[in-house]
């Protein structure tokens, strides 16, 4: 891997820089806190990735090992904290334009585009699966929101805004699915198909 790519900060790197700016932690604590915060709902970061990122960030001087009363036992017991250089790198990365201009490609939309090729009955079954999934996720996020509000003590916090956005998106998609089910009997092929010509 080229050196420039190794220095490029990934989402897991940024999540850890932010977490370790709050307070020093060792890898196990960081994993436990990320799990408690349900970070995997909004950032792709696995347990092994935490340790890989900690090592990378330490090599780049973006985190440092702090003193601990625990005996040295490898990365599990090394306590890391974000350095001033790490906070600056995080702040610089958060200014990039692509945070606000990237468009997601949800797998369900890909499925919908290809669904006209599905066997009879599959469309309705998949819509039902999607609806059930969204209803479960909505319930889970509503419970998460109650928990967050209790923990932070107000509604003007990033976590509240993030979960509120997800709740709004789930509700919006559920409304759209109901509309889709109503319109399904009228589904038809395109009337004016255009083919690209070289």
Where are the regions a protein language model picked out?
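Basic helix-turn-helix/winged-helix DNA-binding cores
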Residues: 1-103
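Amphipathic alpha-helical dimerization/coiled-coil segments
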Residues: 91-139
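Amphipathic alpha-helical coiled-coil segments and their boundaries
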Residues: 120, 127, 156-159, 163, ...
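Acidic interhelical loop/turn segments
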Residues: 143-162
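Amphipathic alpha-helical coiled-coil segments
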Residues: 170-183
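Long amphipathic alpha-helical coiled-coil segments
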Residues: 183-198
């Amino acid at each position: 891997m080229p050196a420039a790519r190794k220095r490029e900060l990934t989402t897991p790197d940024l999540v850890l820089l932010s977490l370790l700016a709050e307070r020093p932690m060792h890898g196990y604590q960081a994993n436990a806190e990320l799990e408690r915060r349900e970070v995997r709902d909004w950032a792709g970061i696995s347990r092994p990735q935490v340790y890989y990122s900690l090592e990378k960030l330490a090599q780049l001087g973006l985190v440092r090992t702090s003193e601990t009363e625990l005996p040295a036992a490898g990365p599990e017991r090394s306590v890391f904290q974000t350095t001033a250089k790490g906070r600056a790198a995080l702040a610089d990365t958060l200014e990039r334009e692509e945070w606000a201009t990237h468009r997601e490609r949800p797998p369900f939309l890909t499925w919908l585009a290809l669904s006209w090729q599905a066997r009879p009955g599959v469309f309705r079954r998949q819509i039902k699966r999607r609806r059930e999934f969204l209803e479960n996720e909505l319930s889970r996020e509503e419970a998460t929101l109650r928990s967050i509000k209790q923990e932070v003590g107000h509604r003007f916090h990033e976590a509240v805004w993030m979960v509120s956005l997800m709740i709004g998106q789930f509700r919006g998609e559920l409304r759209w699915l109901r509309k889709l089910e109503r319109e399904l009997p009228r589904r038809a092929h395109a009337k004016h198909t255009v083919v690209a010509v070289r």
